[in-house]
């Protein structure tokens, strides 16, 4: 089994914005090795006759259908906003074009 180096764990921790001490680095290296060993075992399983799926459990949409409703006192709500433009809330731009 290939040993996962401390440098590899540190790199992954850096990408995940985690601060790890030496003890945690060693602990995570061991855990990652066990995970990779488990994946190797899974790769040996014959899945030739198993149909492809996107999920292990079927997902059903349980959301209600949207219904348009008029609100008579919309001005009251708009007046509570820190900033507005006509009949809309005005919010800071967060996506660059």
UniProtKB/Swiss-Prot annotation:
Gene3D superfamilies: Glu-tRNAGln amidotransferase C subunit, N-terminal domain. It comes from the Bacteria. Its EC number is 6.3.5.-. It catalyses: L-glutamyl-tRNA(Gln) + L-glutamine + ATP + H2O = L-glutaminyl-tRNA(Gln) + L-glutamate + ADP + phosphate + H(+); L-aspartyl-tRNA(Asn) + L-glutamine + ATP + H2O = L-asparaginyl-tRNA(Asn) + L-glutamate + ADP + phosphate + 2 H(+). Keywords: ATP-binding, Ligase, Nucleotide-binding, Protein biosynthesis. One of its GO terms (biological process) is translation. GO terms for molecular function: asparaginyl-tRNA synthase (glutamine-hydrolyzing) activity; ATP binding; glutaminyl-tRNA synthase (glutamine-hydrolyzing) activity. It is an enzyme of class 6 (ligase). Heterotrimer of A, B and C subunits. Allows the formation of correctly charged Asn-tRNA(Asn) or Gln-tRNA(Gln) through the transamidation of misacylated Asp-tRNA(Asn) or Glu-tRNA(Gln) in organisms which lack either or both of asparaginyl-tRNA or glutaminyl-tRNA synthetases. The reaction takes place in the presence of glutamine and ATP through an activated phospho-Asp-tRNA(Asn) or phospho-Glu-tRNA(Gln). Belongs to the GatC family. This is Aspartyl/glutamyl-tRNA(Asn/Gln) amidotransferase subunit C. It comes from Prochlorococcus marinus subsp. pastoris (strain CCMP1986 / NIES-2087 / MED4).
């Amino acid at each position: 089994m290939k040993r996962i180096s401390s440098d590899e764990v540190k790199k992954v921790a850096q990408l995940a914005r985690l601060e790890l001490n030496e003890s945690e680095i060693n602990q995570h290296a061991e855990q990652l090795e066990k995970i990779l060993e488990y994946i190797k075992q899974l790769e040996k399983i014959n899945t030739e006759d198993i149909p492809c799926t996107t999920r292990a459990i079927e997902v059903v949409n349980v959301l209600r259908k949207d219904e348009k409703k008029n609100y008579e006192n919309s001005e009251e709500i708009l007046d509570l906003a820190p900033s507005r433009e006509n009949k809309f809330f005005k919010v800071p731009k967060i996506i660059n074009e």
